[in-house]
UniProtKB/Swiss-Prot annotation:
The keyword Transcription does not apply. This is Mitochondrial outer membrane protein porin 6. It is found in: Mitochondrion outer membrane. InterPro entries: Porin_dom_sf, Porin_Euk, Porin_Euk/Tom40. Belongs to the eukaryotic mitochondrial porin (TC 1.B.8.1) family. GO terms for molecular function: porin activity; voltage-gated monoatomic anion channel activity.
Length: 276
């Protein structure tokens, strides 16, 4: 584990991943292949109701440089070039999408033993600029992020947070949505043998005084099967079962019931990921 603090985006990430990651309520299929030369190919297809969308992504690694190219079902081409450790602790990436001429942006990340810096700059004459910073250690860190639109000379976002991490638990508090939302999250692993873990996230809207919460759990049924559950205010219940039927190849089945949706309260989804 790094000695320094994680980037601001990672504050509260452990709890959020348990509560929301891998839940899927559509039909999704992906196939990933790799070669000894460092070239990887991933094909993904998703069926949403009667709509089918997909993309093909290639990735090539050479030394410290990684090039990703993705073509989606609407013939859009996205390219990202990442250079890792050009200088010690520095990661640089340049991305753009064709035919969108205003999509180009430059991302910089610098990790130090006592702080982490991230910046995103749009490559246009009037760019969007985002800056984020955290200070502290890998256990206790605090940070903030701000976004600025140079076209309208306005602040698009500002958030702040603090996080405390140990190997078996993590707690985080975030002030988000320009100071209008307060979020607190907690995750705790009780049994490292089967990975039995619980997590909770509480959201409070400062203006409207509304409160929301989600609690969830995760544990391994056996060495190749993971079961996740979650429950939200209002009675929404979700279940995810993920089975690794061969190394790095999984099938995930998700189900959710929301009593507030009268017409169709139940949702189901299947995701199959193959990696020969």
């Amino acid at each position: 584990m790094s000695k320094g603090p994680a980037p601001f985006l990672n504050i509260g990430k452990r709890a959020k991943d348990l509560l929301y990651k891998d839940y899927n309520f559509d039909q999704k299929f992906s196939l990933t292949t790799t070669s000894n030369s460092g070239l990887g190919l991933t094909a993904t297809g998703v069926k949403i109701d009667e709509l089918f969308i997909g993309d093909i992504q290639t990735q090539h690694k050479s030394g410290k440089t990684t090039v990703d190219v993705k073509i989606d079902s609407e013939s859009r081409v996205s390219t990202t070039v990442t250079v890792d450790e050009a200088l010690t602790g520095l990661k640089t990436s340049f991305s753009f999408r064709v035919p969108d001429q205003k999509s180009g942006k430059l991302d910089l990340q610098y990790l130090h033993d006592h702080f982490a810096l991230n910046s995103t700059i749009g490559l246009t004459s009037t760019p969007l600029i985002e800056l984020a910073a955290t200070i502290g250690t890998n256990e206790l860190s605090a940070g903030a992020e701000v976004g600025f639109d140079s076209t309208s000379a306005s602040v698009t976002k500002y958030n702040s947070g603090i996080c405390y991490n140990k190997h078996d638990f993590s707690a985080a508090v975030l002030l988000a949505d320009k100071g209008e939302t307060l979020k607190a999250s907690y995750i705790h692993t009780f049994n490292e043998t089967n990975g039995a873990t619980v997590a909770a996230e509480v959201t409070h809207k400062l203006k409207t005084k509304e409160n929301y919460f989600t609690i969830g759990s995760s544990h391994a049924i056996d060495s190749s099967t993971l079961l996740k559950t979650r429950f939200s205010n209002g009675g929404k219940v979700g279940v995810l079962c993920q089975h690794e039927w061969r190394p790095k190849s999984t099938v995930s089945i998700s189900a959710e019931y929301d009593p507030k949706v009268v017409s169709s309260p139940s949702r189901f989804g299947v995701a199959i990921a193959l990696k020969p």
